[in-house]
Amino acid sequence: MPEAPPLLLAAVLLGLVLLVVLLLLLRHWGWGLCLIGWNEFILQPIHNLLMGDTKEQRILNHVLQHAEPGNAQSVLEAIDTYCEQKEWAMNVGDKKGKIVDAVIQEHQPSVLLELGAYCGYSAVRMARLLSPGARLITIEINPDCAAITQRMVDFAGVKDKVTLVVGASQDIIPQLKKKYDVDTLDMVFLDHWKDRYLPDTLLLEECGLLRKGTVLLADNVICPGAPDFLAHVRGSSCFECTHYQSFLEYREVVDGLEKAIYKGPGSEAGP
C-alpha cells in the first residue's frame, strides 16, 4: 500500500487539530463566542500572514480612505461599516455605543478615564461628546494598538481632548494624580481585559481616584463576561448599579454594560 504524501498527512493532522480547537471553543463558549474565537485565533492570524499587515491596520486604512478628516461621526461610521461587512473587531460598536453616548450626555464628565483603547473607536466616540475643557485619558497596553488609536484620534479631530498613555492599567493608575494632574475621576469606561475590571476598580478606590458620584461604565459584562466585577459592585453598598442589556458588537449575541455609581467608602457601613 503506497504511503500518503507528507503534505497530505500534515493537512489531515492540521485539520484534526483545528477540529479539536473548534469543539473546545464550542464547549466552553457556545456558538456565538465560538465563531468569534475561531475567527480571532485561527482565521485572523492566517489572514494577517497572507495580507502582510494586521486587522487593526486595515481598519485604520479603511477610515483614512472613506471617512472625512475632522469628522468624528464619519470615523465611527467608517469603522462600524468595515467591522459589520468585512472583519469583526472588539470595538464597543454602534448598538452599545448609543448607550455609552447616553451615559456621557447624562453625566457630562470633565475628567474621563478609559481602560483599553484598542483602535480608538470608543475614545473618538466619547471625546466627540465632551464639553469644552473636558478631557479623556485613555490607557492602552499594546503599543501597536496605541499608535493606531493616536492616528484615529488625530484624524477624527478630537486630539485636543484625548491623552493617550501606553502601558498596563495597574502601572498607570497609581501615576494619574501626580503625573497626569488628576484629582478625582468623574467617569471610568472599562473595556480592557475582563479579569482586570475588579482589580483596577479596587486600585482606583485605593488611589483615591473615585469620589462620590464617579460613574463606572463597564463593557462586555455578559459576553465574554466579568462575573467577579459584577458580584462586587452589585453586592457592595458603595455602588448603585444599573444594567443595560444589548448585543455584542456587530453580532446578535447577548451582551450588556454595567453602570456603577460610586457612593463613597462610608456607604459600606451597615447593621
Curated annotation (Swiss-Prot):
- Extracellular topological intervals: 27-271
Q: Which disease is it linked to?
A: Schizophrenia: A complex, multifactorial psychotic disorder or group of disorders characterized by disturbances in the form and content of thought (e.g. delusions, hallucinations), in mood (e.g. inappropriate affect), in sense of self and relationship to the external world (e.g. loss of ego boundaries, withdrawal), and in behavior (e.g bizarre or apparently purposeless behavior). Although it affects emotions, it is distinguished from mood disorders in which such disturbances are primary.
Cofactor binding: number and manner: Binds 1 Mg(2+) ion per subunit.
Gene3D superfamilies to which the protein is assigned, alphabetical: Vaccinia Virus protein VP39
Note the CDD domains from the entry: AdoMet_MTases
Q: What stretches pass through the bilayer?
A: 7-26
Listed GO molecular functions? catechol O-methyltransferase activity; magnesium ion binding; methyltransferase activity; O-methyltransferase activity
Cofactor(s) essential for the protein: Mg(2+)
The UniProt entry, under InterPro entries, shows:
Catechol_O-MeTrfase_euk, SAM-dependent_MTases_sf, SAM_O-MeTrfase
* Species for this entry: Homo sapiens
Biological process (GO) annotations?
artery development; behavioral fear response; catecholamine catabolic process; cellular response to cocaine; cellular response to phosphate starvation; cerebellar cortex morphogenesis; cholesterol efflux; detection of temperature stimulus involved in sensory perception of pain
Please outline how this chain is modified post-translation.
The N-terminus is blocked.
The keyword Cell membrane belongs to this UniProt entry's keyword annotation: yes
Q: Phosphoserine: which positions carry it?
A: 267
Q: What is this protein called?
A: Catechol O-methyltransferase
Q: Which UniProt keywords apply?
A: Catecholamine metabolism, Cell membrane, Cytoplasm, Lipid metabolism, Magnesium, Membrane, Metal-binding, Methyltransferase, Neurotransmitter degradation, Phosphoprotein, S-adenosyl-L-methionine, Schizophrenia, Signal-anchor, Transferase, Transmembrane, Transmembrane helix
Q: Where does S-adenosyl-L-methionine bind?
A: 92, 114, 122, 140-141, 167-170, 191
Protein family:
Belongs to the class I-like SAM-binding methyltransferase superfamily. Cation-dependent O-methyltransferase family.
Binding of Mg(2+) occurs at 191, 219-220
